[in-house]
Amino acid sequence: MQAYTEIAPPTAVSHAITLPFLSSRSNNLIVAKNSLLQVFELKSTVTEVASGGEGEADNAAANFDTEAADVPLQRIENTAKLVLVGEFPLAGTVISLARVKALNTKSRAEALLVAFRDAKLSLVEWDPETYNLHTISIHYYENPDVPGLAPWDAELKDTYNFLTADPSSRCAALKFGTHNLAILPFRQRDLAEDEYDSDNEAAQEGKAERANGANGDDAVKTPYSSSFVLPLTNLDPTLTHPVHLAFLHEYREPTFGVISSSKATAASLLTHRKDILTYTVFTLDLEQKASTTLLSVPGLPYDLTQVVPLPHPIGGALLVGSNEIIHVDQAGKTNGVAVNELAKACTSFALSDQADLALRLEGCTLELLSQDTGDVMIVLNDGSIFILTFSLDGRNVSAMTIQPVPADNGGNILKTRASCSTNLGRGRLFIGSEDGESVLMGWTSTSNQLRRKQSNTAQSGDDEDMSDVEEEEVDDLDDDLYNDTATTVKKITAAAAEPTAPGTYTFRVHDVLPSIAPIRDTVLHPGKDTESLTKGEIMLSTGRGAAGAITALNRELHPTMLAQTELPSSNGVWAVHAKKQAPAGIVADFGQDAEANASSDVDYDQYLVVSKAWEDGTESTVVYEVHGNELSETEKGDFERDEGLTLSVGVLARGTKVVQVLRSEVRTYDSELGMEQIIPMEDEETGNELNIINASFADPYLLIQREDSSVKIYKATGDGEVEDVEATGLSGTEWLSASLFQSSSFTEVFAFLLTPEGGLRIFAMSQLEKPSYVAEALGFLPPLLTMDYMPKRSSAKATITEILAADLGDATSRSPHLIVRTSNDDLVIYKAIHSPSRSSSDLWTHNLRWVKLSQQHVPRYMEDGAQEEAADEPGFESTLLALDNINGYSTVIQRGRSPAFILKESSSAPRVIGLSGNPVKSLTRFHTSSCQRGFAYLDSTDTLRISQLPPSTHYGHLGWAARRMPMDAEVHALAYHPSGLYVIGTGQPEEYTLDPNDTFHYELPKEETSFKPKVEHGIIKVMDEKTWTVIDTHVLDPQEVILCIKTLNLEVSETTHQRKDVIAVGTAIVLGEDLATKGNIRIFEVITVVPEPDHPETNKRLKLIVKDEVKGTVSAISDLGTQGFLIMAQGQKSMVRGLKEDGTLLPVAFMDMQCYVTTLKTLPNTGMLLMGDAYKGAWFTGYTEEPYKMMLFGRSKHHLECITADFLPFEEQLHIIVADADMNLQVLQFDPDHPKSMGGTRLLQKSTFHTGHFPSTMHLLQSRLHMPTASEFTTSTTSSLPLHQILCTSQSGTLALITPLSESSYRRLSGLATHLQQFLDSPCGLNGKAFRAADVMEGGWDAGTQRAMLDGGLLMRWGELGEQRRREGLGKVGW
């Protein structure tokens, strides 16, 4: 019984599409990351771009008129940034996205059609009222009774399934199975008026479709008609081997082109099956469910893989192969271009020769740049960018030309291949990648600029002033072409007829979506030093090709410590920056004094105020002057230092007045700390003195909360006087929490107040007579908080102790959020939305709603009771604090025993990330010349730490602190040496040339081609952990590839039995498929050398002590036993070896395997060994040292394709978790007493869990926590056993934990999972339980009653429920 929990979401972008989704006038980007759907909007910012800047294209010529010869070195450009609107985890794997102009959507925009791996289609729209996806319908076709599915056909998971949609939204087609096509028609407005209905002969579809009214009288209410499955062989009997299809532009009826053949294509059969592909165009009759063949082009090259439809003026489609690109127009006329020498050998089709380009088009992506010219961008497998241009003769294509984009024009800004691309309009493209970071890039064209300048249209002079939406309407590539006038067609055709000159296009990176996919190898540092910045808790090798990198992940934030000092008995710190008041008679708004604001130290903090509570009960305040990171105590001014405890310090009156809040009074000072005002706190009716418990600043307002739960508001006038503000709406009411909120998006200041009953009141400072917003149901923590929301039961309320409204975001985008803290330190985050949208003249609270965001942070858990008691002392209570500029972030900090930051990037959701170290008493911003935009905090040890956020670190995309170091090469393996080194196995592609002296290929003719294949040449790099610089490099033999690297503690002397940490490297020498593969095992030791001048980190090198060539690849290495031996998988054997003093490896034991060993894992402190075979499953073996012997204990009884595996011990049971090639986790158990285990020789199959991500590594972890068990199951033996977990990584970039569960915990969590599935929204209408349940192996489960692995991701969504649903769920499971 286990739980699988994703602790980091997928980051590999698999699909992307652009459409107006949020509203009819919006321009949104939809991104699919395997099982995560994200919705973005674009925000334009103004940035400075340096001419010839590093890593970016110099597009100055495209942004200025040709007459302006003296272009400045620094120029201002509009840069587009991605802003996340929402993200939705899916219970399915996305295989395609398509846009549909559906009728009557809630947002009055277009709908999104999502296709999933198991032949499902979901039609979704945006619901502005709930700020969420709304599923219109779901259609599924995996039913084995669907016509056209034969029993011998391949399974759905083994076929290429994809979705394509008609450009005019008349229908969509899902190709699934071997050759089946599911057609889903959509109603059009003109068809709806004619009462078009084809539902009388409805094909078999999902129950969800019928429930939405697909049949009967309600059919006219749905935006779709009944779908039907059409076997491709019904269209043409020769379509037995379809390759690809796509709908085409400019046809009156839905029309698609298909590449297919009647026989299977293969490079090995080229002499017999040359040019056997056929391109056929069919038009569909949706009413008759029939088709008509329009044209057929036979004799096409065998390697064509893709159909790319082109709109007017080019029209037709591009057929993309590995060695050529062919254009077929609407009349069937073809034009092609060969891009390398192999095109002559693989086809006899007539092609123009551009073989000198030597391109490899495998895995390339094509995207239309401009509809005016018809130019197409090609992104190759290595990220290189080329431009395909057309020459027109009238309206016919006469020739095609491919040109490379020079590096100076941005041709190398992409590091790896693209998985998807989409055109966002206005010269912006999104390039998604599964192998590295995804890029939002911009392009400009000098020819377009000149053409636009010479145009006489009125819009040409107003382009710069047009809004994003207006310009998008002009540049939309998907506009209906039927309404184009003849004049427009003539202009576009003339533009396309002009050939594009080389160097015309210039590309520049606008924004980046960070990615850690694919994860290739992992190094763990569970006990790392908290002060180390470059040594993450998890070190990952990520990316492919030139996008390869090393990424350091930290679960908590480890700030850069600049200085620290001891401040005994302190409990509060505040940094203060005060400005001198302007002379009398001069009134200047903040920000208008340009000269003063431009000075370098205009915002630097001058004072640090520290409040202290001594052990004898006395309280005092100390003022320090700040000089960089140095503090010096000062007696300057009249600042109150001895009378009472300082509760808060802030500034008012545009920063000219310093305000000190004491227990019983408020004092104001000038910029030199000279006394100006004393405001006592007294009861207005009785005159009794009242103590202050909280204060909140929002210039020019000050909110004071007093011990009788009353609230007073003060305002700084123009002359600096702080006066009481009459607030009749606030008087006579008790308030549990109160704070002020001032956003960067509006000027009004609001007061957020919490009633003891859990109600929310928002007051505008300009209207304090009554609240501008009332939400009585905040205490119920509903998923959507509105003014009129009220649940049926009024008793199920959460205990809310504090609320705080603040902007969250970065320099690009900030938005208001409401943070709610409960009595057990849980944080609930609400995002402010407006539905319907408000006008700019309305108050911000008009039509305001709050949407609860999903967040999975759990407060810090402490098992040490003494520490917990200490954390409850005065000064350790949790409080929230909003800071507006911490290294560019607008953030909220939670102080107390579980300190945390709430951080958000513009393209990510808010994430709660804990602050490492001790509990935090107080925290303040700290901005000086030595600590730019940093912070200072006081921890439980009375240490003041002046810190900054770590540089070049992302937080929001993973919920981890992630720092990436590019390696510019793919990293295959990674290991850590205790001397402080990382050993990295990389490779460099190089051209392969046949050896003229090769005796194995004597029958081959002499090689004459210049277009040679590329093979990898392995390189070992050594990186210092502190500086992240490469200090040593070892180049391996030609064609030698690194497969694994491990740090082993081996015995290096047979006489003294000395042990030493060494580096073992396993490699493969790949000579071709017709020769046996060899491998090498290399053993390196780390030696100390004389460092290079000024580089002390270069004092270590690797020294080769063993190099042993073996038959077969060395695919896995591990340490074994207690005598310092190693075990290695060499070919089809697993062999135990010992290191001798003469530099040789002595074999002492071995075991024969069957195919290819993918993993070797040992259980620490035992002789147990787990070996995984790529085709034959898992082997559980043992090793003994007296005598040296290996023995087989048990094997999996099914033929698993084992990718990786590991042990999972729990209590007195031993489980084995195997990750297979179908993205499943197989749970096996070694139980020799079970009758089905045949005496232990067969591992029991306990359960199967589908992850949806292709696995890469597994690592056994020992947790610092202990699993809670019911008292009746607890024994003195099991209670002391440590809890183990398995960390899983995947090629999608996910991190996941597999946690074993006790019987009682499993039963309760299983009940909660059932409760959550019932009440949580499932995006796209998918079944989460069915998604996680994999197919049952032959022979069924061995556990009698199957105990499926729990979906921890579902359980972590517990916070999305309202308090009423939570209590219902807890009541069902007995909590």
Swiss-Prot record:
Residues 194-219, 446-477 are annotated as: Disordered. One of its GO terms (molecular function) is RNA binding. The keyword Nucleus applies. Residues 446-460 have a biased composition (Polar residues). One of its GO terms (cellular component) is nucleus. Keywords: mRNA processing, Nucleus, RNA-binding. Its main location: nucleus. InterPro entries: Beta-prop_RSE1/DDB1/CPSF1_1st, Cleavage/polyA-sp_fac_asu_C, RSE1/DDB1/CFT1/CPSF1, WD40/YVTN_repeat-like_dom_sf. GO terms for biological process: mRNA processing. It comes from the Eukaryota. Residues 461-477 have a biased composition (Acidic residues). It is found in: Nucleus. RNA-binding component of the cleavage and polyadenylation factor (CPF) complex, which plays a key role in polyadenylation-dependent pre-mRNA 3'-end formation and cooperates with cleavage factors including the CFIA complex and NAB4/CFIB. Involved in poly(A) site recognition. May be involved in coupling transcription termination and mRNA 3'-end formation. Belongs to the CFT1 family. This is Protein CFT1. The lineage of its organism: Eukaryota, Fungi, Dikarya, Ascomycota, Pezizomycotina.
